Amino acid sequence: GCGKPFCFNTIMARLRARGKVVLAVAATGIAALQLDGGKTVHTGLRIPLDPCGNRRGIFAIPITKNSALGRLIMNDIDLIVWDEAPMTHRDIFDSLDDTFKKLRNDSRPFGGVSIMLGGDFRQCLPVIRRATCAQQTAASIRHSTVFNAFGVVHLITNVRVELCKLRDPSRSQKLNEWAEELLRIGDGEYLVNESESSPFESRLPAIVHSKAIETKDDVFSMIYSLFGDLAELSTMDPRELIKQEAMYSAVLCPLHVSVDFVNRCC
C-alpha cells in the first residue's frame, strides 16, 4: 500500500514525455495491469515458461539481434521497469543479465541497460514446488550475481491506510495498529501468544466450529453467517454499505481449489 505502481507510472510518464523508451513488465498479470503499457515479464522479455519447475541455472532466452525486441534492447531502450521483482526466480535474473550482455556486447550488469525493480520481500517469493525454506531463500533475486548492482530506495508511508483514515478518522488508531501488525508479520516478529492483543478479528461461523466445509449448503451457511443477506447488501446505498461489517470481512482459503469451489457455489 505504499504506492509503488503510482511511482512507477509517474516516472514512466515523465520519461516518455521526454521521448525516452521505457519498457514496463511485472512478475504477474495483475501487477502488469497496474503499469501503463505493462506486460508480464514472460511476454515483454520473452522469458520461457517453466511449468514443471525443472529448469536450473542460466538458460537461453530467445531474443535475437534481428528481432524487434533485440533491436530495442541493443539500440533504443532507456529503462526497464520491473514490478513484483521479488517473485522472480534468481535464474531468470541471471539469464537475462547474460542475454543482455551478449546482445549489447557489454560486460556491465544487464549489458548497461537501466532497470528499476519494485516489490516487497515480505510478500511472495518465487514459487518452488516442495521446496525447503533454504531452497526458497536461495531462489530469491537477492542471491542473484547482479543484485548488489542495484541501489535500494524504501517507500515507508502506507498510502492505502492514510486514504482510509481520511475517509473515516474514527478508525485511525485501529488502522495504524493493523498496518504495524502487518509489518511485524512480514518481519517475522509476530508472536502467536500475543494474539489476544492483536487488532485482527476472526469471526468463525458456528458451522466452521462443528464441521468441515464440503457442500454447497455448507458454503451458503458460512457466507450468510459472515456477510448476511447478500441480496439485501446489493440494494444498499454505498454510504450505508461502507458502514456494514460485511465490508471488512473476508473468507480465507488455503488452496486455489478451495477458492474455486467457494466461487462456484456463490
Predicted segments, located by residue:
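RecA-like helicase/translocase P-loop NTPase motor core
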Residues: 1-266
